[in-house]
Amino acid sequence: MSRRKNIKKRPIPPDPVYNSYLINMTIRRVMRSGKKSLASNIIYDALKTVGERTGRDPLEVFEQAVKNATPLVEVKARRVGGATYQVPMEVRPGRGTTLALRWLIQFSRSRSGRTMAGKLANEIMDAANETGGAIKKREETHRMAEANKAFAHYRY
């Protein structure tokens, strides 16, 4: 970590098709080995599929999915006198969105199916309907925080 001043956070430009920062963040998460055009094709194909299947605006469905998958609390390990406690902490909005996108992509990759675009489309639709792996992960995170509420006074 830097001992001097905090570095400035670089602004991410919105994506050219939907003019959305969220879509660009997702493209960057899906990208592997610097292949951004492939990642953007995957995202746009997935969103097109979502639009066709739901009959709604795909960006709206995607934003709803991310909102549903965003955790409000998480647990962080805190070492106190030789013991490690799982301390529940509130999640900042930026981190919450990042976690939601990470989980959506992670559970899309682990799904069975032919193409990544199809798997991602299914995961987005499931998350928008409050089901799927990303939602299960958020619920599990909330349960962990609830179970460890007694250690909330160790917050830092």
Curated annotation (Swiss-Prot):
Belongs to the universal ribosomal protein uS7 family. The keyword RNA-binding applies. Keywords: Ribonucleoprotein, Ribosomal protein, RNA-binding, rRNA-binding, tRNA-binding. One of its GO terms (cellular component) is small ribosomal subunit. GO terms for molecular function: rRNA binding; structural constituent of ribosome; tRNA binding. It comes from Gloeothece citriformis (strain PCC 7424) (Cyanothece sp. (strain PCC 7424)). Pfam families: Ribosomal_S7. InterPro entries: Ribosomal_uS7, Ribosomal_uS7_bac/org-type, Ribosomal_uS7_CS, Ribosomal_uS7_dom, Ribosomal_uS7_dom_sf. Part of the 30S ribosomal subunit. Contacts proteins S9 and S11. GO terms for biological process: translation. This is Small ribosomal subunit protein uS7.
